[in-house]
Amino acid sequence: YRKKQGNQIKERTTLLQETNTKLIDQKEEKQQLIAQNKREQEKLEDEKKQQDALIATIREKESSYAAQINKKQAEANRIDREIDRLIREAIAASKKESGATTNSETEIKKGAMPTFALTPAAKALANDFASNKGRMDWPVERGRVYKKFGTSKHPTLPNITTYNSGVEIETAPGSVARAAFKGTVQQVQLIRGGGYTILIRHGNYLTVYQNLKNLKVKVNDQVSTKQALGEIAENSFNGKTILKFLVYKDSERLNPEDWIYNM
């Protein structure tokens, strides 16, 4: 009996030892899991801090970039207002020369824009200009459209919208602007932030060439298609050689891409 009892005690002792070993193993495994989870949590927290810091840096850069874009847009708007003023003066001068009044019944109608008074020769030139829509020569010998006409959203800053009153054409350093169509130099003006600006009149149409230096024409010069007007200056904002080219009918801005061949 005692032998049997001894065996039973021995078996229970072995079982208890095995159970205890299992519990110790489970405890160690649990502690390892806790430690691993803690390390992973710390790693996630570090990654989140790095991500937050990166986002803050990106937002700071975006804010700075957006401020630069808004500043450039404000400068462009100021130059546009100056060009619009020059065109209004040219329209008023055309009416004065023809004996017409600047406040005709047509122009005081709601929404009407000031229009040129045209002589028969000016009307013929305007018709010639209009008939060449979509077939005119580029105002540079070689170039590409850097920025299109009209309103556009920034590709990476969705809250930023810009407006371009013409097209901006990038070309090689030292390139010259040339007349897109025959006409008369209506105005030459040095505009702060925009270099020299030349307005060429084609009846009641105008083409405008902005950001020039070393001019080759003067007011009242008759110019032919492709005639050199002046050298294109480097853009102060990005250092590129860019001509800004605009088209007007009377005082209304038009899309130059509709007028220049394959633009």
Regions found by a protein language model. Give the residues of each.
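Amphipathic alpha-helical segments with strong coiled-coil propensity
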Residues: 1-55, 59-61
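Hydrophobic packing segments in regular secondary structure
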Residues: 36-149
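Extracytoplasmic
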Residues: 133, 140, 162-166, 180, ...
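Generic structural motif
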Residues: 138-147, 175-185, 226
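Residue-level recognition of beta-strand microenvironments
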Residues: 148, 188-189, 232-235
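Zn2+-dependent peptidoglycan hydrolase active-site motif and core
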Residues: 162, 179-214
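Conserved, short, structured surface segments that act as functional micro-motifs
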Residues: 198-201, 219-263
